[in-house]
Every structure is written in structure tokens, then in C-alpha cells.
Amino acid sequence: MAVRRRPSRPSRFTPDFDPDFGDRALTDARHDIVIGRWQGVRDLLRATGDDWVRRTHRLRLLSHAAAGSSTAEAWWAAEPHNPDAAVLRAATEVVRVFDTAIAAGRGSPVNRAQLDATVEACLFAADAAPADPMPWVSLLSVARLYEGGVPRRELRGWFDELRRRDPYNTEGHTQLLRYWSARWHGTHGAMYDFARDAAGVAPPGSPLPVLVQVARVEEYRYIADGALGRGPVRGFDQHWKHELAVTELRRTHERWIGGREPGRPVSPEEIADLNCLAHAACYAGQIEVARELLGMLGARASWVPWAYTGEPEEQFVRFREGLGVV
């Protein structure tokens, strides 16, 4: 008698939370850092050239990998006149000073001498690599750790230097947006004003308009953290789906996604911002937009912002399945 086989179940979709978003060359360089080799990092940054978007993305992730080792310092010691070594060293110092701040706990001041030394490393890198926007991104990042912030004129000067080199640098704008957030040295209103002003001048196809959705995530985090142990916040369930949130979501989609070259593959440096926009679309109930964005992402997921609203993998899978994304 023939044995009837059970139909095999389709394998369950699993998101890929690759921190490098599929950038294999970056993954190899980060592995080199772990084992103390800097030559692969040097070669990667040389090959990246003046593709500022990709370079900023790669340097940010390389600096996180380098913060727990002496690889960045070893490279700079071996090649003190290599501007890329100076830029990575400065970015790595920024990560380290943030690690110190996190370890000390919120509200604990960071050692002023360490902050000043980090700023000096960034300014040195800016002199060594005058065309590179990354040292200015690093400065805008470390600025928010100063108790009371930095003088407005100085902050504005750093931002102007960034924009002279890369006027639509999303990472640099994101760092300044966080500076102006209520969590740091501003208010929700100041943060949204900055995001909307930046989005308004971005050219079609630029991801910069997603700053408005980044601001919405920052506001959500701030309110949710403040409500811990105090019960639900009135009206908070409409945070993602009220009229203005939906209007701005659709505007970002139109200006960024609608302005991209049709059929152009999604690059690794776009994945984090695309996750932010997809998250906003899912929670706003914008079915067609969410379906398109999740389709563009495929399996490429980022922990942020999904981790702020629940378990990242569960949400990513649930929305994909609910929207019929294949």
C-alpha cells in the first residue's frame, strides 16, 4: 500500500537583522577589527572614496566595532598621516564617550576632560580630511553629552560645516535632531521644526524627509519612558495614526520613495531609514504604503525602531503576513 505523505509546511519567514544590512565588505572589515587587523579597514575606506552616504554609514558601524579594541589607535600609530585613520579614531572616541555616559547612568555628568578630548580628536580629523563630512557628524553626535549643551553659535558652525560637505547627510541631521529633542537639549516642538525644515529642502529621492518619522519615534520613546509604571497615556494610541502623522508619512513616501530611480536596488545604507518609514506606515494603518516598503526591504530588518514598540521579529513578521507580503 502506498504511503501518503503529508504536505510539507512552508518554512516560516525569518527577518535578517544583519547589522551591516548585507554590506559584505563592511562585515569583513569589522571582523578584521575584532582580531586586531586594521589593513582591511584601510582598504575598505580607500575603496569607498567620496561616496559620502556609504562612507558615513560604514564609518559609523566601524567605529562601534573599534570602540572595544585598540585597532583604531594601532592604525593611526602606524599611518599617522592617513586621514581615514584620523577620522575613524575620532568616530571611535565618540562611541567610547557615549559608552561611558551609558555606564554612568542618565543624569550623571560625563567627564568634561574626556568630552573635550573627543572634540579635539574630531577637529583634528576635520583638518586631516577637509572634504569629509564624518568628523562633523561626530561633533554633532558628541555635542549632546555636554551638560547644558554647547553654545548655539558653535553648534550652528559645526552643522554648517557638515552641510558644506554633504548638505543632505541623513546621519548628521539625525544627530542634531536628537540634540534638539526633549530627551536632550530641546523640546518636541524644536525637534519637529528642525525635522520639517530639513525635509522641506531635500531633493526628490533623498531619504532626508524620513527625519519627521525619526522625530515621531523619538517622541514616542520619551513619552513611553516617562509613563513607565504610571499606566497608559491618554490619546497615546493615536500617536502613529492621527491626521498629521499620516499626512507626513505620505509626504515622506512621495518625496523619498517616489523620487528614487525606478527599479534601483535598495542599498545597505538605506535599510535603517527604510525600516523607520515602514514601521511608521504599518502603525499608521497605511496598507498600500506599508506593503510596498516591506516588499522593498525583503528580509532586511533593523532593530530600531521596531524594538521601541515590542519584540522586533514578531512585529516584522506579523505585519508582513497581515499585509500579504511575499
Which residues make up each language-model segment?
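Extreme N-terminal leader/anchor segments
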Residues: 1-79, 291-326
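Alpha-helix N-cap/N′ positions at the starts of helices
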Residues: 21-24, 117, 154, 272-273
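Short coil/linker segments at helix-helix boundaries
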Residues: 47-78, 91-131, 135-164, 171-204, ...
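Short helix-capping/linker turns of helical repeat alpha-solenoids
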Residues: 81-83, 131, 168-169, 269
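Extended, hydrophobic/aromatic-rich amphipathic alpha-helical segments that build helical scaffolds
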Residues: 83-93, 278
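Fungal-biased detection of long, low-complexity, Ser/Thr-
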Residues: 238-326
